[in-house]
Amino acid sequence: MTPIFLQRSLVEELKALFVDFYSTDDISKTPPKVNVYQQDLPIALGSEEDETVPYIIVRIDSGNIPELNEQERVEVILVFCIKANNENRQGYLDVMNMIQRVKERFFKNFSVGKYFYFEPPFEWAVQDEDTFPYFYGAVKMNFYCPGIMLEDPLL
């Protein structure tokens, strides 16, 4: 199973995980649809930019296979974005809630899809730059994919 299958599994998992997510900025109390994208945002045409927010990007960052017949470790970065228009600038709370939701999910159950599993560390950060009304955060996680087994009869 390739890192791309891992990425697809994570996209589906995160869509399900955030189906009932509420923003602290939303006075209507209707959950906004959290968009989940593979690797990057789609190209925005015209005024479509705000339609992507809130979003999560599932980005494959790097990977390695330390030795023959071993599992592949894939580093994945999740990027979170929320738009919060309120004057108290509390959009970071939504970002932190999203990070917490992901953390709880993967520390309670390491597996995702049929073939992949998370292994700590779990690293997170929030943006310190002022990008009001947009608030950002990120998570770095390691996942393991099944290894490729050597089939050479000469070895």
Ranges and model annotations:
Residues 1-16, 61-71, 112-155:
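Short, charged interaction patches at domain edges and termini
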Residues 1-68, 154-155:
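Small/polar-rich, solvent-exposed N-terminal microdomains that initiate assembly or binding
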Residues 54-56, 76, 137-143:
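A short hydrophobic beta-strand element
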Residues 58-85:
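Active-site-adjacent structural patch at catalytic or cofactor/ligand-binding sites
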Residues 73-75, 93-97, 153-155:
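Short intrinsically disordered coil segments
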Residues 80-85, 101-106, 145:
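Glycine-rich loops and low-complexity Gly/Arg-rich segments
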Residues 81-95:
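Short histidine-centered catalytic/ligand-binding loop motif
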Residues 92-113:
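Short, hydrophobic/π-rich interface segment
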